[in-house]
Each structure stands twice: as structure tokens, then as C-alpha cells.
């Protein structure tokens, strides 16, 4: 009896390229699902302790606060109401 055919790559390359051969997706953060709880907790604390320091022109400098920090919503609403009241008062005159 003759041996049977085991494998063929006929037409496979064309089929593979039809939708394009894409690179595998690299995720920024790997899942910690199923990891031992104690190990995961230790990793979290270790990550906090090894934060990268910010360098500017080779010297250590403090991270400066923003020039215009974000205002609380109450302050923004109060300013808008005051502006609207001023417009109404100017319109009545």
C-alpha cells in the first residue's frame, strides 16, 4: 500500500496574505488575573518604591505646580452666576 500525503502548503500563503499578516498586539499592562494575592500585593508596593525620578537638563528639579490649576466646580459655577448677574444688571440700566 502507498504512503498517504501528510502535509501541503499549496495556496496557504495566498490565503494568509488576503487579510494581511499583522503583528501581534502588545499590551501595555499584562493582566494579574490568577496571580497569587501576596505576590501581586508585593508587586504593587515595589512599583510604588521604584517610580522614575524626573530629570531636566541632567539636574534633579522639583516638579512645579501648574500655572492655572483646575478650579473646583463650585467656584466655576459661582463665577458664572456672578458674571450673568452683572450682565443682567448692566442690561437694566
Curated annotation (Swiss-Prot):
Q: Which UniProt keywords apply?
A: Ribonucleoprotein, Ribosomal protein
Entries under Gene3D superfamilies matching the protein: 6.10.140.1730
Q: Which InterPro entries match?
A: Ribosomal_eL29
Region named Disordered: 1-33
Keyword Ribosomal protein carried by entry: yes
User: Compositional bias (Basic residues) at which positions?
Assistant: 1-31
Q: Which domain of life is it from?
A: Eukaryota
Set out the biological process GO terms recorded for this chain's protein: cytoplasmic translation
Q: Which family does it belong to?
A: Belongs to the eukaryotic ribosomal protein eL29 family.
What protein name is recorded for this chain? Large ribosomal subunit protein eL29
Source organism of the structure: Dictyostelium discoideum
Amino acid at each position: 500500500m502507498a504512503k498517504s500525503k501528510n502535509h501541503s502548503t499549496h495556496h496557504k500563503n495566498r490565503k494568509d496574505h488576503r487579510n494581511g499578516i499583522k503583528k501581534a498586539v502588545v499590551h501595555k499592562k499584562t493582566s494579574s488575573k490568577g496571580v497569587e494575592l501576596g505576590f501581586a500585593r508585593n508587586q504593587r508596593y515595589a512599583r510604588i518604591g521604584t517610580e522614575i525620578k524626573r530629570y531636566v537638563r541632567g539636574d534633579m528639579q522639583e516638579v512645579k505646580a501648574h500655572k492655572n490649576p483646575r478650579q473646583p466646580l463650585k467656584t466655576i459655577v459661582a463665577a458664572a452666576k456672578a458674571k450673568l448677574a452683572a450682565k443682567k444688571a448692566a442690561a437694566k440700566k
